[in-house]
Design a protein with these regions (language model features):
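Short amphipathic helix-loop junctions that connect adjacent transmembrane helices
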Residues: 17-33
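Loop-to-transmembrane helix entry/capping segments in MFS-fold secondary transporters
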Residues: 31-32, 117-127
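Helix-to-loop junctions at the C-terminal end of transmembrane segments
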Residues: 48-61, 146-147
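Structural signature of the two symmetry-related core transmembrane helices
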Residues: 64-79, 156-159
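Helix-loop junctions at membrane interfaces in 12-TM secondary transporters
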Residues: 81-93
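Intracellular juxtamembrane helix-capping segments at the cytosolic ends
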Residues: 102-115
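A membrane-interface helix-boundary motif in multi-pass transporters
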Residues: 144-162
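Multi-pass alpha-helical transporter architecture, strongest
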Residues: 158-190
């Protein structure tokens, strides 16, 4: 469960915190337009989070939905980084953000379904640690790359890391779709495990 989170965390850490710098550097965007872009992005994240459970039903499972949304988001990530026009890069940013963030609640829910209740806190902590490993190193790496080469290598590296995370998620968990969730004990009884 943690390897995909490490890859996504590092991929995000080298690029996502610097979107304001990227848009300023690449397109000389005004602060008010940048603020509007980020506001719309937050709104789309909320809408995507609401739609994600329905998407997992349509696609036949949480893992399928996680992998599909992450892989499609790669197209828009690269569009954002390599577009020649602000409007096209902005569309890429908005769609990448919505799609990539749709997968997070689904992956978290999947992990909790596969974990006995008494271990939920530990699993959440480990997933958070895995995500933050990338954020501990990523900003330094990003700063060095930005100074020497600009943003384009960071977009490529992030796309590769996100793709690796999606492939790992699919490889590790595709066979668990459709399996029953772990039974959870109720207040007065122990769980009954199938034999």
């Amino acid at each position: 469960m943690t390897l995909p989170q490490i890859a996504i965390g590092f991929g995000a850490a080298i690029l996502i915190p610097y979107m304001n710098v990227f848009f300023k550097y690449q397109f000389n965007i005004t602060d008010s337009l940048l603020g509007l872009l980020f506001s719309i992005s937050s709104l789309l994240i909320g809408i995507g989070s609401i739609l994600a459970p329905r998407l997992s039903v349509v696609l036949g499972g949480k893992i399928r939905a996680v992998v599909v949304t992450q892989m499609i988001s790669l197209v828009f990530l690269l569009l954002m980084g390599f577009a020649l026009f602000l409007w096209l890069s902005s569309v890429g940013y908005l769609l990448r953000t919505a799609l990539m963030n749709m997968s997070a609640p689904l992956y978290s829910a999947f992990c909790m379904e596969r974990t006995p209740e008494q271990h939920h806190g530990l699993v959440n902590s480990v997933l958070s640690l895995a995500w933050n490993i990338g954020w501990a190193v990523g900003p330094f790496v990003s700063g060095v790359v930005q100074q020497r080469y600009g943003f384009k290598p960071l977009f490529v590296a992030t796309a590769i890391l996100y793709a690796v995370a999606s492939i790992l998620t699919w490889a590790f968990f595709r066979h668990t779709e459709g399996m029953p969730e772990l039974p959870q004990p109720t207040l007065f009884q122990s769980p009954e495990y199938p034999e």
